[in-house]
Regions:
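Nucleotide-activated chemistry modules centered on ATP-dependent adenylation/adenylyltransferase
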Residues: 1-180
């Protein structure tokens, strides 16, 4: 991983422009910390595909925030990815699988659709960070992920780094973050 020591923006530039041109996507939840990475990617290349998993369980505020960030950052290829309706009908006919089996819900609403969406890409960009804890504490900047390479440009960022980036870049906050 010859680019593993670069700062986040430099790592993104290397991955997007040199290592995987036209073969890399960003996966984003458009959640509370997402604007930082979306902004960084848009600064390198606003045409990079952004994969948004529309699970059918998201708050309206998240969808509004997604739309606002797309416009503000000039993102030109945001792809709303949905679970397969037939798979949902089989696995979660009542729409309450999340309350009975969160792992199965995540599988049908996120894992399977993401795998389909990543077909045709060699690499993808993730906003995961070590400070989120658990199995992320040992997160590296570049990792193998099955048939793909996963780029984690914010792996070493702290909460303060995120706050500073939002302030310096004057990024809007997620409406639910603002509500506490």
């Amino acid at each position: 991983a010859r680019h593993g020591k670069l700062d986040g923006l430099a790592l993104l530039r290397a991955a997007i422009e040199w290592e995987f041109p036209g073969r890399i996507a960003l996966v984003s939840s458009f959640g509370a910390e997402s604007a930082a990475l979306l902004d960084m990617v848009s600064r390198v290349d606003p045409t990079v595909p952004v994969i948004f998993l529309e699970t059918g369980k998201l708050f309206g505020e998240t969808l509004d925030y997604r739309d606002a960030l797309i416009e503000r950052l000039g993102l030109t290829d945001v792809r709303d990815i949905h679970p397969d309706p037939a798979e949902l009908e089989t696995a979660d006919p009542a729409g309450d699988l999340w309350s009975r089996d969160p792992d199965a819900c995540c599988h049908v609403r996120k894992v399977v659709p993401l795998a389909r969406a990543l077909t045709g890409f060699d690499a993808w960009i993730s906003g995961r960070k070590r400070f989120h804890g658990g199995d992320r504490e040992g997160l590296t900047y570049i990792e193998a992920d099955g048939a793909h390479i996963k780029i984690n440009p914010l792996a070493g960022w702290t909460r303060d780094d995120i706050e500073t980036y939002y302030e310096v870049r004057e990024l809007p906050r997620h409406p639910l973050f603002e509500q506490g």
